[in-house]
Amino acid sequence: MAKGKDIRIRVILECTTCTRNSVNKKSTGISRYITQKNRHNTPSRLELRKFCRYCYKHTIHGEIKK
């Protein structure tokens, strides 16, 4: 059995370009992805390059609070 807090947690990644400038987009919305991270290996905020379907290009997606 697991003791204490879980090591792997679920995090939500949100497009940083969509949240900054919502004027230059072709369609409305904010791209979000759900993934997991290991709390011991990555204690800081997670940032990954993912495809944003609203900006139509690969952008940096950062971890947000739940």
Swiss-Prot record:
Location, primary (coarse class): plastid
Any Pfam family: Ribosomal_L33
Cellular compartments annotated: Plastid, Chloroplast
GO MF annotations in UniProt: structural constituent of ribosome
InterPro entries: Ribosomal_bL33, Ribosomal_bL33_CS, Ribosomal_bL33_sf, Ribosomal_zn-bd
Keyword annotations of the record: Chloroplast, Plastid, Ribonucleoprotein, Ribosomal protein
Gene3D superfamilies referenced in this protein's UniProt entry, alphabetically: Ribosomal protein L33
PROSITE patterns in the cross-refs: RIBOSOMAL_L33
BP GO annotations: translation
GO CC field: chloroplast; ribonucleoprotein complex; ribosome
Family that this chain belongs to: Belongs to the bacterial ribosomal protein bL33 family.
Protein name in the entry: Large ribosomal subunit protein bL33c
